[in-house]
């Protein structure tokens, strides 16, 4: 069975994906930020989630990648590809095996063949997606059947680059929002969301996760 999905960002309220700063993202991210964006406890929570959910020796895409991927130590991987906006940040990322500079807000079509990856992760960056449903459709395309998609976020952001609907939402609302992106994109199943380090936060930065898997149904894009 094959199903055709169309972009559905227009199913959200008008202006949902507008930002205070609509300048070119490549300009905003041109200067490398060689820092982490969550604290050590939150990093440990993200790393443990990856270790728990991504099988050893997987082929993984770190979408919207930067200076660090928070890949768990001593967890073998076959390939960890970064896709982001700053080459210097990704060049200095010790977890990545390779990387590509690409702006998904300009072009959500990911530059990879169908069914390339066992897993795709977006780490503390979904708030910046201006075409999330389109992007998630292409995440589904590059995932192998039953491949896992893990989106994590905290309460930190560059507010001028975060989309309006994200800034206006609560933490619970943001989990529901990311879940809705997956649902609208189609061909994702077993969508689950949760506050993964609630017992440690505070003092640790909070980490929320939305996780799904590519279904066996084939989708045309």
Model feature map: region roles:
Residues 148-180:
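Conserved class I S-adenosyl-L-methionine
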Residues 2-55:
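Class I SAM-dependent methyltransferase Rossmann-like catalytic core
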């Amino acid at each position: 069975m094959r199903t055709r999905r169309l972009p559905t960002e227009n199913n959200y309220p008008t202006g949902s994906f507008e930002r205070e700063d609509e300048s070119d993202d490549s300009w905003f991210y041109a200067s490398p930020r060689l820092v982490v964006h969550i604290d050590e406890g939150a990093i440990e929570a993200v790393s443990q989630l990856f270790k728990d959910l991504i099988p050893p020796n997987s082929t993984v895409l770190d979408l919207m990648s930067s200076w660090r991927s928070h890949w768990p130590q001593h967890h073998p991987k076959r390939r960890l590809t970064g896709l982001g906006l700053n080459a210097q940040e990704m060049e200095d990322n010790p977890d990545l095996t390779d990387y590509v500079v690409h702006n998904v807000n300009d072009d959500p079509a990911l530059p990879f063949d169908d069914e390339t990856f066992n897993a795709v992760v977006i780490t503390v960056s979904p708030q910046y997606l201006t075409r999330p449903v389109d992007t998630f459709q292409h995440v589904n395309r590059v995932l192998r059947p039953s491949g896992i998609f893990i989106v994590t976020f905290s309460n930190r952001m560059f507010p001028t680059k975060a989309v309006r609907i994200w800034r206006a939402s609560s933490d619970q609302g943001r989990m529901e929002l990311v879940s809705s992106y997956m649902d609208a994109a189609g061909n994702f199943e077993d969508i689950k969301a949760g506050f993964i380090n609630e017992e440690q936060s505070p003092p640790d930065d909070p980490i929320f996760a939305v996780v799904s898997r590519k279904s066996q149904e084939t989708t045309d894009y």
